[in-house]
Amino acid sequence: INLNGQVLLLDGAALDFTQFWQKIYASPQNIFHACSEDIDLIYHYAQQRPLHNVFDTQVAMAFLGHGLQVSYQNALKTCLDIDIEKDQTRSDWLARPLSQEQLSYAANDVLYLMQLAEALKNQLQQKGIYDFVLQDCQSLTKEIAMQTPLDELYSDIGNYRHSRRELMQLQ
């Protein structure tokens, strides 16, 4: 998490996030890059939907003509001329303790996010399209909220490979 320039690494498996979820929903704006998975997890664990105060830098990049799915790494290079390593993307994030490489990767994943967001907001405002990006981000978070209800998530677990009995067990 990047909180006003201070990077904090939190272990979701070891903490109670109840107050944290409340702060996210009360925050004037939460900044993400490619927010879908993060938003889905927030909805699942916070038990609250939808999150309205989102600015997604990937959506902003698309509005500025950089393509629909620009990676965080490429967004940083394009907008800020910053290179970051993405070599830990597929490492085992469930194993504890996390390696120093994983911790550095996690910190870099948010270290430049606010700086990137500010650069993008400036470009969007200059083009007069900032409000359209905010509307699109709000539509995206609503769409994620309308996807599979929490009590039916079991059915998303490769149900085409499971028998009715296995699906009942998952439920």
Give names to the regions the model predicted.
Residues 1-123:
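Conserved DEDDh/DEDDy metal-dependent 3′-5′ exonuclease domain
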Residues 103-170:
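Mixed-charge, glycine-rich, non-catalytic linkers/tails in nucleic-acid processing enzymes
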